[in-house]
């Protein structure tokens, strides 16, 4: 349903990439919103037209309470008292995904999860493009979803965060999946993990197919979510898409058929097996030719900043996993590293903004494998007090890397998998990963 907004009094809160895309969305429809950002100098202020009213450096309570539509960017907290008051008054509060899904009718594949979202989004979109389809890819991967409205596509593949799902109500995905759930964003969900899970499960509402991780009970949809359920798993023999050992190799099995030997893959680790199983399930649902999908899996070499080998010298491997911004992602990275580690030691860089996460699980794993730990950033001190052994504390990643360079020996692995957000010291996880890569090549 295409909504008419001409008589709406619209306020946009947050003026980064998403906020700018929302502004352009309304200007094209003849509506001039008001712009609010608590930052004094929002990142997109240079692109603000002179005729648009704005309030920077604080929230404007009067504007908010007199709006009839409030559009919030993902970084805006919904538990702010003035936002809560607006919702109590019946003022509509939505995000960019909600605006988008009201405008389009083509099939949507919707992907969320604590880890692996970007990888699965890229896999499915590559499968569709290789099949000759026109595909719109956007969401939490850095491309504002509203930018896709400039042209029509046959299929939309959306990576959606929990923050975006909190203010999305009209999503009706052809296929929706929660890849996995681990503790994350506890600074935004004060009621704890259950509140975070409820946010994630909003992706299933009104979907046609729910693609479910059989290995993670936290991802299971409610009985009334979705018309059909399709499952994937590495260890469940009842899953529709699974991994099985067959003729001397692990194989990807789809609905009982052995479709691809893992020996043919460029990347062989547990993280990518799960991503590939879910991507194949999603692509099969929208009827992308399987022969095309399997070819994409064969040649997929991974994403930048996601468990990426960026340098190897003197038999020392330097792995950039800067995209690991929560405990679950770092646990996966450690487990995958330990499998390949022979006689050397693992040096782990951990730190940034921990988002009030509990690092106890991580400390047990690190102590079990006698990992050398280097903490840095906003929560570096907190991390050193989380029960870890053999810990070095640095102000920043540069100092930590210099310490590592003096300690590292042949056959060692250096892993940046911070379990924390990057915004305390970097503009993004990409900037953090790029600095690690530069330092590895210089110091290694």
Swiss-Prot record:
Protein localization: Cytoplasm
Catalytic activity reads: UDP-N-acetyl-alpha-D-muramoyl-L-alanine + D-glutamate + ATP = UDP-N-acetyl-alpha-D-muramoyl-L-alanyl-D-glutamate + ADP + phosphate + H(+)
The domain of life is Bacteria
Q: Does the keyword ATP-binding apply?
A: yes
Provide the leader sequence positions. Answer: none
- What SUPFAM superfamilies does the entry give? MurCD N-terminal domain (SSF51984), MurD-like peptide ligases, catalytic domain (SSF53623), MurD-like peptide ligases, peptide-binding domain (SSF53244)
Member of which family? Belongs to the MurCDEF family.
| This protein's name | UDP-N-acetylmuramoylalanine--D-glutamate ligase
What is the phylogenetic placement of the source species in the record?
Bacteria, Pseudomonadati, Pseudomonadota, Gammaproteobacteria, Enterobacterales
């Amino acid at each position: 349903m295409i909504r008419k907004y001409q008589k709406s009094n619209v306020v946009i809160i947050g003026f980064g990439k998403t906020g700018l895309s929302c502004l352009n969305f309304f200007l094209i429809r003849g509506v001039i919103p008001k712009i609010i950002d608590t930052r004094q100098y929002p990142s997109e202020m240079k692109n603000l037209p002179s005729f648009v009213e704005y309030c920077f450096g604080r929230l404007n309570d009067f504007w908010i309470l007199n709006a009839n539509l409030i559009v919030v960017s993902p970084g805006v907290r919904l538990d702010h008292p003035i936002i809560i008051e607006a919702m109590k008054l019946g003022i509509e509060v939505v995000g960019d995904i909600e605006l988008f899904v009201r405008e389009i009718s083509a099939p949507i594949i919707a992907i969320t999860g604590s880890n692996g979202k970007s990888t699965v989004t890229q896999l499915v979109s590559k499968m569709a493009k290789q099949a000759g389809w026109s595909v719109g890819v956007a969401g939490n991967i850095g491309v504002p979803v509203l930018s896709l409205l400039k042209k029509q596509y046959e299929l939309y593949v959306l990576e959606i965060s929990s923050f975006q799902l909190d203010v999305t109500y009209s999503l009706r995905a052809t296929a929706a999946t929660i890849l996995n759930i681990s503790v994350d964003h506890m600074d935004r969900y004060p009621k704890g993990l259950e509140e975070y899970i409820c946010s994630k499960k909003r992706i299933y509402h009104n979907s046609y197919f729910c693609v479910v991780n059989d290995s993670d009970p936290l991802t299971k949809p409610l009985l009334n979510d979705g018309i059909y359920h399709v499952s994937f798993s590495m260890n469940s023999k009842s899953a529709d898409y699974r991994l099985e050992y067959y003729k001397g190799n692990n194989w990807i099995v789809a609905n009982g058929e052995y479709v691809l030997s893992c020996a043919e893959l460029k990347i062989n680790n547990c993280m990518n097996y799960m991503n590939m199983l879910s991507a194949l399930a999603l692509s099969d649902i929208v009827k992308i030719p399987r022969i095309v999908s399997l070819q994409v899996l064969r040649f997929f070499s991974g994403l930048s900043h996601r468990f990426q080998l960026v340098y190897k010298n003197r038999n020392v491997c330097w792995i950039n996993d800067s995209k690991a911004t929560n405990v679950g992602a770092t646990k996966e990275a450690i487990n995958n590293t330990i499998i390949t580690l022979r006689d050397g030691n693992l040096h782990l860089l951990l730190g940034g903004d921990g988002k009030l996460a509990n690092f106890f699980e991580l400390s047990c794993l690190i102590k079990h494998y006698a990992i050398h730990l280097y903490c840095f950033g906003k929560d570096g001190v907190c991390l050193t007090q989380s029960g870890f052994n053999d810990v070095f504390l640095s102000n920043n990643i540069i100092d930590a890397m210099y310490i590592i360079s003096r300690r590292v020996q042949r056959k060692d692995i250096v892993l940046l998998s911070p379990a924390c957000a990057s915004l305390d010291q970097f503009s993004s996880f990409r900037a953090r990963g790029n600095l690690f890569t530069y330092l590895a090549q210089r110091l290694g």
